[in-house]
Structure formats: structure tokens, C-alpha cells
């Protein structure tokens, strides 16, 4: 699998505020004064300069996120989210307010992050990884295997903030998703539904040039196969046969130049000997830009073969 990674110049700046005190030449000695206390400030978030540093940054962000969850640091968890953040899980879609109970109830213990892959797409940091953790929901144990996750970050007010998150950790069998507990903006929801429908219909109709044009360089995907990139997406579109996509409970939110679109998607697929059922499943797509120039930078599909 080839995953395109885009990196730009990076500077880690440390701010110092030294104070210097000078006495005039030949001045009479005076009682010693206490040195001025140095002031410190958290360096503003900046972009790494190479692939290794980009992955290191992504690893730090994901580990920090899961440590806050494991510590039940709900204040820290909330602070890491942008106001219009959305998260997709097997249960459905959540915004910052409605996600707090979900995150707390998971009872996350001993999270272990691996296989971190980071790409830069414009001002967005797209990250996929595998996470192994002890979690449960409604008394049901989630998979104890290392499962795919996807996150999208942006720099907001000098700090890395999450625009979207998706988890593919589920109990078996996967239950039917619930409708989101938040309504969102009707106009944005309609816009998001139209953009996602356009993408999925191009795949369904095998309009491959049009489909290809909607995929950003640096796109990352998580699905039942694991972590995928743009080339994998195109290869899958060529080989797969998909049912007519049906979107329900669509929610769309703006984070800078990103449109985070979620829904419960019903779209069966067949690829070689693998069949994905036409069951509703939470789905996430993050678009960058607007109109015909918009491109998808991140996709998470929680559906899987039975």
C-alpha cells in the first residue's frame, strides 16, 4: 500500500523572556538583587519539516488523546476538540457535547497506539493508526484487537485541535446505529449530503475519472480492511460493485475550510469474494474546499462483512 505523505517546513520556536540588569560603571556596590523570574509560554503549534517528524507529531497527538480518555480527563478531552468536531463510532455520530458521555462510558484502559500514518493536506493533518485498548459499551466488550482509528487535526489559535475522529472498534455482532442526538444546521446538512452523494454515486456508476478528481492527494481511509490510502481507494473503486447509496441522519459541520460530513450509510458492496451487507452503518467523510473544487481528505466506513 502506498500512502502519499506531504510535509512542509517546520520550526519549533521557544519563547524566552530574559531580563538583564546592568549597573553603571564605577557605581558603588549595592545590595544584591534577586534575578528576574524567567517567563515561559507554550510554543505555538507549527508544522513538522519532514515525514518522520510528521509521524512523530501524529503519534504524540493520538497518544495524548487516549491518555486523557484513559485518565477520564474530560476537560482535556473537550479542549482537544474544535467546537464543530464530529466523532463516528459503531453507535453512531456525536458532537463535542454528546460525545462526553460516550467517551466516559467506554472505560478505556491501557491504550496502545501503533502503525501511525500521517499526511498533510492543506492545513489539515490526517492521521490513521491502530489502537489496542480494553473498552466496553452497554456491558458489551469491544474488540480487544488493535483496531483502525482516523483523526483530522488543524491548528486553531496556536494549538492542534481535532475536527473529526472515527473508531472502528465494535462489539460482535455490530448493532444498528442510532440517530445523532444533535440536529446540526439544516443548510449545512443538506450541503454535506449533496457532496457525499456526489462522491458515492461516482463510485457506484463507475465514473472513475470524476471519482478520482474528488480524492485529495494525502487522502486516508479506514475500513474493515484497515488503513488505506488514495491508491487503495481507486483500486477498490475499480474492482468493487456497490449498491445505490442511501444516506440517513446526515450531519455536516464546518471546521475552517473543512466540511465534516457524517451519516448512517446503507450501501452494500462486493469485492471479489467479499460481501459487505446493505446494512446502515456510521460513515464519515471530510471534505476540503468548496463547490466543484472540494476534495475528500479522510473517509471512515464502519460497515464490515458479517
Residue ranges and their predicted role:
Residues 1-5:
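Positively charged n-region of N-terminal signal peptides that target proteins for export
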Residues 9-24:
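Bacterial N-terminal signal peptides
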Residues 29-83, 169-213, 217, 254:
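Short, low-complexity N-terminal intrinsically disordered segments enriched in polar/charged residues
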Residues 34, 126, 146-176, 280-306:
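Short beta-strand edge/turn micro-motifs at domain boundaries
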Residues 65, 77, 85, 99, ...:
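Hydrophobic pocket/interface hotspot
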Residues 75-112, 212-246:
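Short solvent-exposed beta->alpha transition segments
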Residues 81, 91-92, 117-122, 129-133, ...:
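A mature extracytoplasmic/lumenal domain signature
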Residues 100-143, 235-277:
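Surface-exposed, charged secondary-structure patches
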Amino acid at each position: 500500500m502506498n500512502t502519499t505523505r506531504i510535509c512542509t517546513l517546520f520550526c519549533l520556536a521557544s519563547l524566552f523572556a530574559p531580563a538583564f540588569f546592568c549597573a553603571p560603571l564605577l557605581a558603588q556596590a549595592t545590595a544584591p538583587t534577586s534575578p528576574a523570574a524567567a517567563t515561559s509560554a507554550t510554543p505555538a503549534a507549527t508544522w513538522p519539516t519532514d515525514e518522520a517528524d510528521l509521524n512523530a507529531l501524529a503519534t504524540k497527538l493520538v497518544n495524548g488523546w487516549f491518555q486523557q480518555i484513559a485518565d477520564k480527563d474530560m476537560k482535556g478531552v473537550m479542549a482537544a476538540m474544535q467546537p464543530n468536531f464530529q466523532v463516528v463510532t459503531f453507535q453512531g455520530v456525536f458532537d463535542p457535547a454528546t460525545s462526553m458521555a460516550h467517551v466516559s462510558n467506554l472505560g478505556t484502559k491501557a491504550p496502545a497506539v501503533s502503525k501511525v500514518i500521517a499526511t498533510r493536506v492543506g492545513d489539515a493533518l490526517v492521521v490513521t493508526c491502530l489502537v489496542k485498548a480494553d473498552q466496553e459499551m452497554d456491558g458489551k466488550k469491544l474488540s480487544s484487537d488493535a483496531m483502525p482509528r482516523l483523526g483530522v487535526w488543524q491548528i486553531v489559535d496556536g494549538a492542534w485541535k481535532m475536527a473529526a475522529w472515527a473508531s472502528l472498534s465494535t462489539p460482535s455482532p455490530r448493532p444498528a446505529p442510532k440517530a445523532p442526538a444533535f440536529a446540526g444546521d439544516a443548510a449545512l446538512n443538506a450541503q454535506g449530503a449533496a457532496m457525499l452523494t456526489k462522491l458515492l454515486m461516482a463510485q457506484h456508476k463507475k465514473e472513475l475519472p470524476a471519482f478520482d478528481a474528488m480524492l485529495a492527494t494525502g487522502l486516508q481511509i479506514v475500513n474493515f480492511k484497515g488503513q488505506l490510502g488514495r491508491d487503495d481507494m481507486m483500486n477498490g473503486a475499480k474492482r468493487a460493485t456497490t449498491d445505490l447509496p442511501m444516506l440517513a441522519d446526515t450531519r455536516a459541520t464546518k471546521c475552517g475550510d473543512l466540511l465534516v460530513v457524517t451519516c448512517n450509510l446503507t450501501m452494500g458492496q462486493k469485492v471479489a469474494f467479499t460481501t459487505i451487507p446493505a446494512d446502515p452503518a456510521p460513515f464519515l467523510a471530510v471534505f476540503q474546499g468548496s463547490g466543484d473544487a472540494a476534495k475528500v481528505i479522510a473517509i471512515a466506513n464502519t460497515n464490515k462483512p458479517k
